[in-house]
Amino acid sequence: MRQFLYCEAGYVEKNQWLPNSWVNVECPTPEDLQFLMDRFNVPESFLSDIADTDERPRIEYEGNWLLTILRIPLQNQDHDIPFNTVPIGIITNNEIIVSVCYHKTDLIPDFIRYTQRKELQIKNKYELILRLIHSSAVWFLKYLSLIHISEPT
């Protein structure tokens, strides 16, 4: 799923990409990946790195592109292992912000709703990256409290 998000009073979805907007891609199809490479020249190596479920958090530069990989929490339906982490990549240059996650998570939709509720004005890519890191930490703590509640006494 591909979303074009523009920050007004929080992030709102638009029908097409606008300069300084955020392209969020969740569970990308081959067409989504090709779109990112063709339309925005996103490095293919970045997209394949994010696809690796064992990818570790890091930053990497390639030309004028910056790749930031985070590990974000994911709730599983498997009762033996109720929680896991998956990589999300935030790919930026001077004109675009792209996030790619190969898994459906609660983090990004919740983050978008939060920016709308608080009418946040996120001014640049660095602020967005830091706010996504913070949101990830909030979800880790939320899931940690669920683990604590469900522990047998």
Regions found by a protein language model. Name each.
Residues 1-150:
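Peripheral, non-transmembrane regulatory/ligand-interaction domains of membrane transport proteins
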